[in-house]
From Swiss-Prot:
Belongs to the histone H2B family. The gene is htb1. This is Histone H2B-alpha. Its main location: nucleus. Monoubiquitinated by the rhp6/ubc2-bre1 complex to form H2BK123ub1. H2BK123ub1 gives a specific tag for epigenetic transcriptional activation and is also prerequisite for H3K4me and H3K79me formation. H2BK123ub1 also modulates the formation of double-strand breaks during meiosis and is a prerequisite for DNA-damage checkpoint activation. Keywords: Acetylation, Chromosome, DNA-binding, Isopeptide bond, Nucleosome core, Nucleus, Phosphoprotein, Ubl conjugation. InterPro entries: Histone-fold, Histone_H2A/H2B/H3, Histone_H2B, HISTONE_H2B_site. The keyword S-adenosyl-L-methionine does not apply.
Length: 126
């Protein structure tokens, strides 16, 4: 065979697996998991109203609400730590952020419950 009669080189790079086998490897990874507060919301609902259920849409709305409040508090606490030239967010920054974000009575109750929870956690950790 002369140089003019040789077959053109294949377009696929040597050493790489064909695409269809790579797709089957992706299938083995499993589902992408979404982390939500659904189980915790459900537990609180059952503590407050044992005979009441909740729809999927209502659960999605509450989950979105919790994520939103969490993000607001974390952002505000981060700003407070930066103002005070601290690299760590402590319970004090969280408490101040809650007071700044939540209105009136709601902030007072949130701070009280938060303090109670931190105290309970600290005493059980020892």
């Amino acid at each position: 065979m002369s140089a003019a009669e040789k077959k053109p080189a294949s377009k696929a790079p040597a050493g790489k697996a064909p695409r269809d086998t790579m797709k089957s490897a992706d299938k083995k990874r499993g589902k992408n998991r979404k982390e939500t507060y659904s189980s915790y919301i459900y537990k609180v609902l059952k503590q407050v109203h044992p005979d009441t259920g909740i729809s999927n849409q209502a659960m999605r709305i509450l989950n979105s609400f919790v994520n939103d409040i969490f993000e607001r508090i974390a952002t505000e606490a981060s700003k407070l730590a930066a103002y005070n030239k601290k690299s760590t967010i402590s319970s004090r920054e969280i408490q101040t952020a809650v007071r700044l974000i939540l209105p009136g009575e709601l902030a007072k109750h949130a701070v009280t419950e938060g303090t109670k929870s931190v105290t309970k956690y600290s005493s059980s950790a020892q």
